[in-house]
């Protein structure tokens, strides 16, 4: 029955499926400023009004000056403001209190991140793994893509260790998506391959 199957899945002596850690790719909309507070907002805030204002300012400035430079400057200023939420200080720290939604446990604890996704995206991959491994052997790893990959590698290592501890297996499989491959290479470089059964890029 289902209970017996779940118990079997947790028993490494009878379970042949290594837990899977899915290292997602870069997520432009996945970073939040002041997450969990009343001031929470996405680090990337597009506003059509700001875009139209920039175009008006740039075009009118170029016409008035009979020079294209005012238009280019308006575009540069607009881009700087649009991407300001991603800004980092010279010391490598974030300019703002930026964080990403994290899912430290297995996918069985977060059905909302995969149950209704049927695609080739990371969440679709998570669903495929959760339904076939099952969910208690599936981990979706998210990260702040602005950070040094070797710093992100430490968090990947923690996720790998958690997957091993919770599943009872001695190794994991790592599936990478896009920029997640860079982060995974940093993990393998820093921590080695001893806890990895296979890695799919």
PLM features: residue spans?
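N-terminal non-catalytic accessory region
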Residues: 1-175, 179-201
């Amino acid at each position: 029955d289902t209970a017996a199957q779940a118990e079997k899945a947790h028993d490494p002596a009878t379970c042949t499926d290594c837990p899977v850690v899915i290292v997602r790719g870069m997520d432009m909309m996945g970073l939040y400023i002041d997450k969990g507070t009343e001031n929470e907002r996405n680090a990337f805030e597009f506003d059509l009004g700001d875009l139209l204002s920039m175009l008006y300012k740039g075009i009118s400035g170029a016409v008035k000056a009979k020079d294209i430079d005012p238009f280019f400057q308006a575009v540069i200023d607009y881009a700087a403001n649009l991407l300001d939420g991603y800004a980092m200080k010279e010391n490598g720290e974030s300019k703002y209190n930026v964080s990403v939604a994290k899912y430290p446990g297995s996918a069985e604890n977060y059905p909302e991140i995969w149950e209704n996704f049927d695609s080739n995206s990371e969440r679709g991959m998570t669903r495929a793994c959760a339904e076939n491994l099952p969910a208690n052997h599936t981990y979706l790893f998210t990260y702040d893509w602005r950070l040094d990959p070797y710093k992100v590698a430490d968090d990947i290592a923690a996720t790998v260790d958690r997957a091993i501890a919770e599943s009872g297996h001695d190794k994991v499989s790592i599936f990478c998506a896009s920029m997640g491959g860079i982060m995974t290479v940093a993990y393998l470089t820093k921590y080695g391959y001893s806890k990895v059964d296979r890695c799919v890029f």
